[in-house]
């Protein structure tokens, strides 16, 4: 037996290791394959039947997909410890608007949501460097190449002696959800996995 899961990269490396470890203590013989991606990839994999369920953004998903459970996660700004903005207690999009950003690809839900929030106040953000890996993003930040706006979960393991993490005001949240095909009946393995996953997902912020 095998469990196939599509998952946002920003969630997979933070939440899934401990959940999978616990799941395997109960189901050691079930194989698990994780399909990591951004944006519409998660729901596409669900619709195509490539995976049993997806963990992705519920801001943008097609009608062929249903939401099992939903949580909110806030965004934060990440910069080098000695950055000029590090002395501020909180960061606004106006503070960041003129700065070079290190960002996820345009296809990512994160990028789309941030751009939409900026446009509401008449800002077009300067996405000077694009990468699809957080480790690469953080290395670029340390090199002084820019600032990033990321979900708070991805900064849990950052070395706070090198990085400064600041709250963004007004708060920007994204909605995360477990996604399944509409009218899909979950199998026992999926149900057991979600039973372990959902409490962790709710604590993501």
Q: Regions from the language model: what does each represent?
A:
Residues 2-6, 54, 78, 102, ...:
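Short, well-ordered beta-strand segments
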Residues 11, 15, 165-205:
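A late-sequence structural motif
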Residues 38-51, 56-57, 107-164:
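Hydrophobic hinge/microswitch elements
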Residues 85-86, 100-121, 186-194, 201-205:
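Secondary-structure junction motif
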